[in-house]
Structure formats: structure tokens, C-alpha cells
Amino acid sequence: TKPSQMLPIFEFCRHIAGERIVPLISVHPDNTMNEVGVLFTRAAEAGIKGVKLHPMYQGFAIDDRKMYPVYQLIEHFGFFVVFHTGYDMAFPGNTQADVERVKTIADQFTDLTIVSTHVGGWRQWDRSGVLGKCRNVYTETSITMTEINDDQFIEALSQFDEDRVLFGSDSPWSDQKEMLERTLCLRIPDRRK
């Protein structure tokens, strides 16, 4: 949530990275592009695969042009980016992570692999279908099943090709085991589970 956390997050990620743990680094909009470039070089050398950004906590809109150089570097290094997408209960009324903003970036940076969290956008499931049409956008399932019923969840998932949906739990806000069990019980083909 602040520029000074960029390197400690990287060091932690580098330390825990392994075959079963794929940690994500982060940068802050106030980090210089030189700092970001150095970090991304070190991250690539360490085998880091992606970057997590949370617009509300980091103080930027997903489609803010000041972030374009960061997205270009993410694209250049072959990383993927995970955006918190949609509503955040700590920031009522904030639109910095709205689904439409992700769509703008997906259209501008067609080689950038994007993961739009919470089945396209937390509490924006009625609008997340626009992301399902973007070939470079994936989604993940974290915490969504705690908010909507199974039928609504399945409908939201259906907006995305099955090979672009990832399992997520948003631990510690939801229990990983419980989310996995609920996923396995969904009335969808096993190949989608």
C-alpha cells in the first residue's frame, strides 16, 4: 500500500516461491519507473510470474494513464497482472477498480495477461460479461460464493471460457477448504471444476 513496501514484498515472495506456491510481487504508482524496472528484472531472475495490484489501497484507477508504463513493463517481462476488481467494502462508492476500467486496459494492452478477481468484479457480476469477451482476461473465484447463491455464481462463471477461470479463496477472508468443497459440489461439468 506504499512505495517502501515494494522490496520487502519482493524479498518475501522470493523466499516462499516454490513448485506449489506462486507468490505475486507488487509495485506502487509512486515507485519510479527505474525502481520498477530493477524490481522486475530481479523478479524475472527469481522466477516470479506475476504482479498483484489493488487500486483502492494503492490509490490509482486501473485505467489511469500514469499506470500505462507499469503495464508496458509487466507485458515486456511476460508477467501477468492480478487486479482487485469491483467493489471493496472498505471503500464504498469507489470506482477505481470497476469492470469497465479493466476492459479499457485489456483493450489497450492486448498482450498483457490480466486476472480480474472475484469472478470478474466483486458485486459487479452483472457487468463482468464484458471481460469474458477479452481473450487476455482470466478471472478467479475468490470469496464470491460467500456473497451469491450457486445459480448466480454459475451464471457469472459462464461469462468466461472455462479455460480462463481460476480457483481462488481470498484467504483469510474465506476458508480455502470450504471454498474448494463448495466448488466441487457445484452443478457444473467436472471439467470446469
How would you describe each model-predicted region?
Residues 2-89, 93-96, 133, 147:
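Active-site gating/metal-coordination segments in enzymes
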Residues 6-11, 99, 125, 177:
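Short, surface-exposed alpha-helical segments at coil->helix boundaries
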Residues 13, 43, 51, 74, ...:
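Conserved, mostly hydrophobic/aromatic
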Residues 42, 159-164, 174-193:
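Mid-to-C-terminal alpha-helical segments outside catalytic/metal-binding sites
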Residues 49-50, 63-166:
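Catalytic pocket-lining loop regions of alpha/beta-barrel enzymes
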Residues 55, 59, 120, 145, ...:
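Structured beta->alpha junctions
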